[in-house]
Amino acid sequence: MTNQYEAVGLKAKEYEGIVEMLGREPNELELNLYGVMWSEHCSYKHSRSMFKHFPTSGPSVLQGPGENAGIVDIGDGLAIAMKIESHNHPSAIEPYQGAATGVGGIIRDIFAMGARPIALLNSLRFGELEGDARVKYLLEGVVEGIAGYGNCMGIPTVGGEVYFNQSYRGNPLVNAMCVGLIEHDAIHRGTASGVGNSIMYVGAATGRDGIGGASFASATLTEESEEKRAAVQVGDPFMEKLLLEACLELLKTGSIIGIQDLGAAGLVSACCETATRGEGGMEIDVLKVPRRETGMVPVEVMISESQERMLLIVERGREEEVNEIVKKWGLHSVIIGRVTNDDKLRIFEGDKVVGEIPAESLDSSGAPRYEPDYAPPADLAELQKLDIESIPEPRDLSSTLRKLLASPNIASKEWIYRQYDHMVRTNTVIKPGSDAAVLRIRGTKKGIALTTDCNSRYCYLDPREGSKIAVVEAARNIVCSGGKPIAITDGLNFGSPETPEGYWQFRESVLGLSEACREMDTPVISGNVSFYNQTEKGSIHPTPIVGMVGLIEDISKTCTMAFKEAGDIIVLLGQTKAEIGGSEYLASIHGQEKGKIPHLNLSLEKRLQKEVLALIQGDLVQSAHDLSEGGLAVGVAECAIAGGIGARVEVNTELRNDIVLFSESQSRFLMTIKPEHLETVQERLKQSNIPHEQLGTVIGNELQMQINGNVVVKESIGELEEIWRGALQCLMESMKID
């Protein structure tokens, strides 16, 4: 028979610790509160000990990890708030609502800081798409959910990434990122301080949806998980839009001491987090909490994850001022408690105390911490072995390029992003489909560049080096758009931390991210960890997603990947080596997921990025694109397709033809230069000791690639574009979903 504490997800030692701390056994309500608050999703009990490795401060960081979102200065008294969070398990069970409420939750985190949300991004992972109706159902539902919520909120979804791999077959990943704009003096935090100040509840009424959501997100997905649809929240974007406007207006009045959204674990989480930050306590009465269902008991009220709700700490005597503004926006507000001078979270049901717990003991800072044993997977050494000579070289490399452009991981994601409103508010300068999205900051000359990145196949084969590559690839995308990378938010998605292999993958990824962020001067200002992304058949590939923001001082100096004019000179920065381990070429063409991933030289990477950005800002670059999945051939094709113009490329090398075309060697940029600027650019690259070579010319309507004088690729740009743009839509339409 299962013990009561096991039923709420606690271990025997954890329960014993609770009894010792309280000096008594917890009652049913208290036990349930510990169950959700000490779940992995809320407590970070297996990951928190690794956070110390992250660089989290810097001259531009105004708020690092620990609040609802991180904030970084962009000058002119303005700042950017940003955060990424996962909603993986809910999206696996109920893809539309799972994705929609993931978007809603991250938006609330941003406006809880006092920032107006200005952009959304996402990073998605699914199983192999071809011939799998279940994967198509999940993809359709997730995309519709993201679009349905973001579009209704009037916040543009400007970028993201989508990858397909069989490791995500039963456990898709849905990571949502939100970015907000805020003035320095408007920053607010989730702190409950000032004894006697009122605790006010604002927004939607509380129901039973989402009960146990935090615990559900902290468990392995099984066949029985379908029965837990009640743990998936239901969102209302129109309610959230009203809530956003009401909260931003309230924050301008000076009446709000602290503000916190009701997200994972609902009311109990918001109460204990704000009380702990304020180093005090709190009393609340569950009978005063608005409900939309009858018969709800205190524990249901406390842990419900109903959406579109906020907790406000209001200066005593100004409650009516709050009520009037909330009412103006068609919402409901009510006083449910007050700040106290002890350290307790005291829960009343009318006059009766039904729970009394030290607030800090519920908070993640008071939860147990674990540092499990770790070891690399037993088959890792074998996985990393790859004899390139055993890989047959395709006879028709044009056909190989066409196949790669049709791969769902490389093909255009237009089928997805055309469902998103990416132009609402008319600040989007560079739209989805380029290396990074770019938004103007109205009233200034500035802009920001935004991207999300992670090659999870690299992280599967080498989590530390793969995580470094995630950081620098994000930075490359920012730089290619004309921005200087300034900060990241990380979404760390892994399997179980309770296996040596799972924790080793997580630990290695954190160390890799930390090293790269330190070298690239991009502090980690916020983030999220999602463990137990696995099914009974196995774990997902390690997926540490990097969301990055870059600053563009002069919005007129942005850059895109598109080839611009016939006669422009194509220049490759960096060196191509025999590195196809973990590549899209090896996986898509040869069906192998193995090998040593490409080597990364962080020092060279930093020098390269600095020089590329300087060249773009100096108006010496026509187009810029980083080379990643698919290598040189795919990169040139993408630039040609984007510009609607062809290219002639010539390479002299001792490498095999397929390796020249499809190697994914790191620290490479493809740029086009006007002929009159070529000498200047080459001299600057030479002075900076940047390896580079002139590859060819932008010309005509064909892509022609020669290696050692032999034409190995000759394709019509129009035909390549048709393949690239149509591949994903063709796959989605090949098996209609009822």
Swiss-Prot record:
GO terms for biological process: 'de novo' IMP biosynthetic process. GO terms for molecular function: ATP binding; magnesium ion binding; phosphoribosylformylglycinamidine synthase activity. It comes from the Bacteria. InterPro entries: PRibForGlyAmidine_synth_PurL, PurL_linker, PurM-like_C_dom, PurM-like_C_sf, PurM-like_N, PurM-like_N_sf. The keyword Nucleotide-binding applies. ATP binds at residues 44, 83, 490, 527. Pathway: Purine metabolism; IMP biosynthesis via de novo pathway; 5-amino-1-(5-phospho-D-ribosyl)imidazole from N(2)-formyl-N(1)-(5-phospho-D-ribosyl)glycinamide: step 1/2. CDD domains: PurL_repeat1, PurL_repeat2. Substrate binds at residues 86-89, 108, 233, 305-307, 530. The active site is at residues 41, 87. Pfam families: AIRS (PF00586), AIRS_C (PF02769), FGAR-AT_linker (PF18072). It catalyses: N(2)-formyl-N(1)-(5-phospho-beta-D-ribosyl)glycinamide + L-glutamine + ATP + H2O = 2-formamido-N(1)-(5-O-phospho-beta-D-ribosyl)acetamidine + L-glutamate + ADP + phosphate + H(+). The keyword Magnesium applies. Mg(2+) 2 binds at residues 109, 261. Keywords: ATP-binding, Cytoplasm, Ligase, Magnesium, Metal-binding, Nucleotide-binding, Purine biosynthesis. One of its GO terms (cellular component) is cytoplasm. Mg(2+) 1 binds at residues 85, 528. Its EC number is 6.3.5.3. It is found in: Cytoplasm. Belongs to the FGAMS family. Part of the phosphoribosylformylglycinamidine synthase complex involved in the purines biosynthetic pathway. Catalyzes the ATP-dependent conversion of formylglycinamide ribonucleotide (FGAR) and glutamine to yield formylglycinamidine ribonucleotide (FGAM) and glutamate. The FGAM synthase complex is composed of three subunits. PurQ produces an ammonia molecule by converting glutamine to glutamate. PurL transfers the ammonia molecule to FGAR to form FGAM in an ATP-dependent manner. Monomer. Part of the FGAM synthase complex composed of 1 PurL, 1 PurQ and 2 PurS subunits. PANTHER family: PHOSPHORIBOSYLFORMYLGLYCINAMIDINE SYNTHASE SUBUNIT PURL. This is Phosphoribosylformylglycinamidine synthase subunit PurL. It comes from Alkaliphilus metalliredigens (strain QYMF).
